[in-house]
Swiss-Prot record:
It catalyses: L-threonylcarbamoyladenylate + adenosine(37) in tRNA = N(6)-L-threonylcarbamoyladenosine(37) in tRNA + AMP + H(+). It comes from Ralstonia nicotianae (strain ATCC BAA-1114 / GMI1000) (Ralstonia solanacearum). One of its GO terms (molecular function) is N(6)-L-threonylcarbamoyladenine synthase activity. The lineage of its organism: Bacteria, Pseudomonadati, Pseudomonadota, Betaproteobacteria, Burkholderiales. This is tRNA N6-adenosine threonylcarbamoyltransferase. It is found in: Cytoplasm.
Length: 347
C-alpha cells in the first residue's frame, strides 16, 4: 500500500510517500523559519499562505523522486489536527481534492501520533509496549503506548510546553528565532552550576510538568544582571542558558525514568523537536542504560514536523483498522484534539 502524507499544521510544509512493503519512498519538506524570523514567531496567516504556495510543488517532487504517478497512490493521509486552523485547512483541502479526483481513501492523522510513531520509521525500531516522551513547541506529554491507536496519557504540562519554554527563554536572552536551537547552542559554552534554577514539579509525585516558573526564574536573572546587551554579557548569558537547559533536562529525564519504572516499561521513545536536543539524548541514554532501558529516537530530520511521519502514521492506522478511512470528502480539521480521542478499538 502506497500512502501519500501531507503535513501543514504549523510552519513546515511536508509531503512524503510511504510504502507498507518497501518503506519510505520519498519525502520533501519546506520550512518557513526564514519568513517568520523577522516577526520573532509564527504568523498564522503568513504560514497558511505559504503552505498554499509550497504543497503542490512538493507533491510533484516526491512523485518524481519515487518514480510514481498520482494514480499509483493507494491512500492519502493528512494532518487533521492539532495545529493552526488555517494551516491545517490547506493540507486538508489538498488531500481531499486529490482523494476526490483520484477516487482514493483518506485518513486524517493526529499530528502528535505522527511524532509518537516516527521512531518506528527507523531500522532499529521499538516493539510495543513502550513509554513515549513527546516534547515539542506546543506539547510535553508522557504516554503509554500499547499499540497503534492504544495511547494512555500519564502526564502533561500544566502551562508552558518544554519547547515553548525554550523559545521564550531565547527571547529573554536576546537570541534569534527559532529559539530552541539557539538556546541549546549557547548552552554548549556555558559553565555548569554558574546559576541555580528551579526544577519545577520534580518531586510532585505525578508525571505532570510545569515550565512557566522556570521561564520566570530566567527573567529574574536577566533583569538582575542586565544580561540582554553588550559583549561583556556573553559568558553570563551562556551560563544562564546552560542552567536553563540543565533544569529542563533534569525534569524530563527524572519523570520519564520514573514513569518507565512504575509502569514496567523497558523501552522509551522520545519524539518532537526538543527530542533533538543533544543533552537530553545523552542523559536519557546514560541514565536509561544504567537501568536496563532502551531509548529510541527518530532520525534528526524527522524530529521536527514532516510529511514522512504523517504518511507512516496513516499507513499504520489503516493497517490496524481499515475502518479508519474517512467517510466522504470534506474540509473539517480539529485544531484542538486530544491524542486519547483517536483510540482504535481492539477486536
Amino acid at each position: 500500500m502506497l500512502v501519500l502524507g501531507i503535513e501543514s499544521s504549523c510552519d513546515e510544509t511536508g509531503v512524503a510517500l510511504y510504502d507498507t512493503d518497501a518503506g519510505l519512498r520519498a519525502h520533501a519538506l519546506y520550512s518557513q523559519i526564514a519568513m517568520h524570523r523577522d516577526y520573532g514567531g509564527v504568523v498564522p496567516e503568513l504560514a497558511s499562505r505559504d503552505h498554499i504556495r509550497r504543497v503542490i510543488p512538493l507533491l510533484e517532487d516526491v512523485l518524481a523522486e519515487a518514480g510514481v504517478g498520482r494514480a499509483d497512490i493507494d491512500a492519502i493521509a493528512y494532518t487533521k489536527g492539532p495545529g493552526l486552523a488555517g494551516a491545517l485547512l490547506v493540507g486538508a483541502s489538498v488531500a481531499n481534492a486529490l482523494g476526490f479526483a483520484l477516487g482514493k481513501p483518506l485518513v486524517g492523522v493526529h499530528h502528535l501520533e505522527g511524532h509518537l510513531l516516527s521512531p518506528l520509521l527507523e531500522a532499529d525500531r521499538p516493539a510495543f509496549p513502550f513509554l513515549a516522551l513527546l516534547v515539542s513547541g506546543g506539547h510535553t506529554q508522557l504516554m503509554r503506548v500499547d499499540a497503534v491507536g492504544q495511547y494512555t496519557l500519564l502526564g502533561e504540562t500544566l502551562d508552558d510546553a518544554a519547547g515553548e519554554a525554550f523559545d521564550k527563554t531565547a527571547k529573554l536572552l536576546g537570541l534569534g528565532y527559532p529559539g530552541g536551537p539557539a538556546v541549546s547552542r549557547l548552552a554548549e559554552f556555558g559553565n555548569p552550576g554558574a546559576f541555580e534554577l528551579p526544577r519545577p514539579m520534580l518531586h510532585s509525585g505525578n508525571f505532570d510538568f510545569s515550565f512557566a516558573g522556570l521561564k520566570t526564574a530566567v527573567l529574574t536573572q536577566v533583569r538582575k544582571l542586565n544580561l540582554d546587551g553588550g559583549e561583556a554579557c556573553e559568558q553570563p548569558r551562556a551560563d544562564l542558558a546552560r542552567a536553563f537547559v540543565d533544569a529542563i533536562v533534569d525534569v524530563l529525564v527524572a519523570k520519564t525514568l520514573r514513569a518507565a519504572r512504575e509502569h514496567g516499561l523497558k523501552r522509551i521513545v522520545v519524539a518532537g523537536g526538543v527530542g533533538a536536543n543533544r543533552q537530553l539524548r545523552e542523559r536519557l541514554n546514560a541514565e536509561g542504560g544504567k537501568r536496563g532501558l532502551r531509548v529510541y529516537y527518530p532520525d534528526l530530520q524527522f524530529c521536527t514536523d514532516n510529511g514522512a511521519m504523517i504518511a507512516f502514521a496513516g499507513a499504520m492506522r489503516l493497517q490496524a483498522d481499515p475502518g479508519q478511512v474517512q467517510s466522504g470528502y470534506g474540509y473539517g480539521v480539529t485544531p484542538r484534539w486530544d491524542l486519547e480521542d483517536i483510540r482504535i478499538r481492539q477486536a
